[in-house]
Amino acid sequence: DITPQLFAMEMKPYRELHLFAAGGCCGTTPEFIKLLNSVFAGCVPGRSAHKMPSVLCTPVDFVNVDGITVVGERINPTGKKRFQQALREEDMNYVLEQAVSQVEAGAQVLDVNVGAPGVDEPALMPKVVKALQSVTSLPLQLDSSNVEALENGLRVYNGKPIVNSTNGEQEKLDAILPLCKKYGAAIVGLAIDERGILPAAEDRVAIARRITEA
């Protein structure tokens, strides 16, 4: 057993660490906490050097995206007639083949874009998301300018995905950011706005700051 006085004495060296919190567990009483409080009276918490990592996840895997991250971009119909046909026909086998090939090639995240002529994107996005999560544990990056399609995909996604993308246009921020907040998604932010790509670096930084502070 330890007395309240000894407990407080043993805790005193930790004052120098400028802890954010100190307390007692089972076995301590109000007297323990009273003396502990006197030890830490006036102690100013320090600033933590620990940075929370930026991660995406599925139920069984996660990816830290703070550094270089390999994103597979083949689940995208742009310039791919065969892929567009597969989407119109809801040929999930073809879509899943593209996913598996990218996983085998070392992709860490899979971009998912199902926007093509003749495709009901809001209806197809959740079907593709669910099909992909049945064959791969990699996180998905939902890629669409259709807000309804994004929400439908986010609703069925298991884990924390990333949305591709938003920019500094207020209309885009107002449409996309609430979805990301609602479903806990990360987001790709592009340092452009209604003026396009600005030549001055400080202007792009200002747009990036506008996105992160929105």
Describe each PLM feature range.
Residues D1-A214:
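Domain-level signal for soluble alpha/beta catalytic cores
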